[in-house]
Curated annotation (Swiss-Prot):
Signal sequence bounds: none
EC class: ligase
PANTHER family: TRIFUNCTIONAL PURINE BIOSYNTHETIC PROTEIN ADENOSINE-3, TRIFUNCTIONAL PURINE BIOSYNTHETIC PROTEIN ADENOSINE-3-RELATED
Name by which UniProt lists this protein: Phosphoribosylformylglycinamidine cyclo-ligase
Stated family: Belongs to the AIR synthase family.
Catalytic activity: 2-formamido-N(1)-(5-O-phospho-beta-D-ribosyl)acetamidine + ATP = 5-amino-1-(5-phospho-beta-D-ribosyl)imidazole + ADP + phosphate + H(+)
One Gene Ontology cellular component annotation held by this UniProt entry: cytosol
Localization: Cytoplasm
Superkingdom of origin organism: Bacteria
CDD domains in alphabetical order: PurM
Keyword Hydrolase attached: no
Pathway named in the protein's UniProt entry: Purine metabolism; IMP biosynthesis via de novo pathway; 5-amino-1-(5-phospho-D-ribosyl)imidazole from N(2)-formyl-N(1)-(5-phospho-D-ribosyl)glycinamide: step 2/2
Length: 345
């Protein structure tokens, strides 16, 4: 009777050595993001972080998000170096809306078969996003789960914690009729609407490598999400910000009302900016109604800020000095009864 061949975890599809190699590869990316509040090093069971001492009454603000089906395009076109930036951006841009400074970030990377090179590229992108937003990449989890994902497909989730002075929380309660609205330009579709984008590509049979205004269509679609943290922290410190809306899934119609009092509505001047060419292409190729465009995509606007009308000029000057493309996009008006809270003229 023959002796059965001993089985190992690797025989079952989990390569511990590959996981260890990944940890070694990403150490420099993690180190680059370190903040003075971080205690200990990568690899502990839990990650430790002190609260910054400058806060008198600190309030923690948390958020979690993913990259959605933009990952499908990234995987299909083997473009893994910027989806990590997307992951961080989707989390930290939500935190800054409430005035919070991002403090630390954790990621979850799940795959059927761990490809160390791909995972390293992704996590390096996460490190870059954390560096751009000033938060520490403090830990994460890499889960190799054979049978759960097809081949080397992977999924990402991010978790971020920020901190804000209790007296300085931005929650929209200061918004009032007469306030001005400022828009900050997006870098593209960011990380929302990609199921519709992929449907447009399928139905139109467009070549993703086709030229669109000087660069391939796929480059427009995979442009990483813009991170607004540093410029908005400066604006918050130097102006009187009443509210901010991160234009993500649900577009204008769903996100702006989240930060408005019931008695206010946002009046947006639709002719105050020109949609980036990728949105014009999507609308034409997919025969998408304008209402649906504003419901699904950011249409070139990644963030909207409400502030007193007499602060507009100084705010625009500050934002442009910080490298933002920003403009006066509309105003806040009184809302009557059951009026819609967003009006695009």
């Amino acid at each position: 009777m023959s002796t059965p061949t001993p089985l190992s975890y690797k025989d079952a599809g989990v390569d511990i050595d590959a996981g260890n190699a990944l940890v070694q590869n990403i150490k420099s990316a993690v180190k680059r993001t370190r903040r003075p509040e971080v205690m200990g090093n990568l690899g502990g069971f839990g990650a430790l972080c002190e609260l910054p001492t400058k806060y008198k009454h600190p309030v923690l603000v948390s958020g979690t998000d993913g990259v959605g089906t933009k990952l499908r395009l990234a995987i299909d076109f083997k473009s893994h170096d910027t989806v990590g930036i997307d992951l961080v951006a989707m989390c930290v841009n939500d935190l800054i809306v409430q005035g919070a400074e991002p403090l630390f970030f954790l990621d979850y990377y799940a795959t059927g078969k761990l490809d160390v090179e791909t995972a390293t590229s992704v996590v390096n992108g996460i490190g870059e996003g954390c560096f751009q937003s000033g938060c520490a990449l403090i830990g994460g989890e890499t889960a190799e789960m054979p049978g759960m994902y097809e081949g080397e497909d992977y999924d990402l989730a991010g978790f971020c914690v920020g901190v804000v002075e209790k007296a300085d929380i931005i929650d929209g309660t200061k918004v009032k009729a007469g306030d001005a609205l400022i828009a900050l330009a997006s870098s593209g579709p960011h990380s929302n609407g990609y199921s519709l984008i992929r449907k447009v590509l399928e139905v139109s049979k467009a070549d993703p490598q086709m030229d669109l205004n000087g660069k391939p269509l796929i480059k427009h679609l995979l442009e990483p999400t813009k991170i607004y943290v540093k410029s908005l922290l400066k604006l918050i410190a130097e102006s009187d910000v009443h509210a901010m809306a991160h234009i993500t899934g649900g577009g204008f119609w769903e996100n702006i009302p989240r930060v408005l009092p019931d008695n206010c509505k946002a009046v947006v001047q639709g002719d105050s900016w020109q949609w980036p060419v990728v949105f014009d292409w999507l609308q034409t190729a997919g025969n998408i109604e304008t209402y649906e465009m504003y419901r699904t995509f950011n249409c070139g606007v990644g963030m909207i800020v409400a502030l007193p009308a007499d602060k507009v000029d100084a705010a625009l000057e500050l934002l442009k000095a910080e490298g933002e493309n920003a403009w006066h996009i509309g105003h806040i008006a009184a809302r009557n009864g059951d009026e819609e809270q967003v009006e695009i003229l």
